[in-house]
Structure formats: C-alpha cells, structure tokens
C-alpha cells in the first residue's frame, strides 16, 4: 500500500495541489490500481502475439502539408503574449526538480 509521503511525491511530480483528505483517498485508490496491475502481471501471455492496438486501424493520421501563412501580424496579434516575431509561452520545466 502506498503511504501519504509517496502520494505527496506523485502529486508533486504531476504538479497537483492536493488536500490531506485527497492524499488519503488517493493512497487507497492508487494502491488498488497497483494491486490490479500485479494481478495482470500474473497472467500467462506466453502464446499471445504482441499487439499495438486492440482494434486494427489503418490510415489514422493525415499526411502533413506545408502552407505559407501570409498575414503573420494577424497571427501574432492573436497570441496572448507575443514577443517580437515569436510566441512567448509559460515555462513548464524547472531545473530544481528532484
């Protein structure tokens, strides 16, 4: 079973701010999920061929195409925080991660 400290670490890595009640609840739920995966790992899959999808699909992605967009100023004006000829986006990576 996961303890509250492990749940806090998972929440930190997922950038979630959770309450102490949620820590307790998530500890139980995540433990149940891990127990289920443990059961799945006990299954005999010796003669089961590997698959990438449960249902075979083909042509599920479109071909990439390049088109010039001639009104660059209009596009930049739609951005919430343009900086010169670029889009300024929020920082998502920290260097002080564990």
Curated annotation (Swiss-Prot):
It comes from the Bacteria. Keywords: ATP-binding, Ligase, Nucleotide-binding, Protein biosynthesis. InterPro entries: Asp/Glu-ADT_sf_sub_c, GatC. Residues 77-98 are annotated as: Disordered. The keyword Ligase applies. GO terms for biological process: glutaminyl-tRNAGln biosynthesis via transamidation; regulation of translational fidelity; translation. Heterotrimer of A, B and C subunits. Belongs to the GatC family. Allows the formation of correctly charged Asn-tRNA(Asn) or Gln-tRNA(Gln) through the transamidation of misacylated Asp-tRNA(Asn) or Glu-tRNA(Gln) in organisms which lack either or both of asparaginyl-tRNA or glutaminyl-tRNA synthetases. The reaction takes place in the presence of glutamine and ATP through an activated phospho-Asp-tRNA(Asn) or phospho-Glu-tRNA(Gln). This is Aspartyl/glutamyl-tRNA(Asn/Gln) amidotransferase subunit C. It comes from Crocosphaera subtropica (strain ATCC 51142 / BH68).
């Amino acid at each position: 079973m996961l303890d509250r400290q492990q749940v806090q670490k998972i929440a930190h890595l997922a950038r979630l701010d959770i309450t102490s009640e949620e820590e307790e609840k998530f500890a139980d739920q995540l433990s149940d999920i891990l127990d289920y995966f443990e059961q799945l790992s006990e299954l005999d899959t010796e003669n089961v061929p590997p698959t990438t999808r449960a249902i075979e699909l083909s042509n599920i992605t479109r071909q990439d195409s390049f088109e010039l967009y001639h009104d660059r100023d209009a596009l930049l004006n739609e951005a919430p925080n343009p900086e010169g000829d670029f889009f300024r986006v929020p920082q998502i990576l920290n260097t002080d991660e564990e």
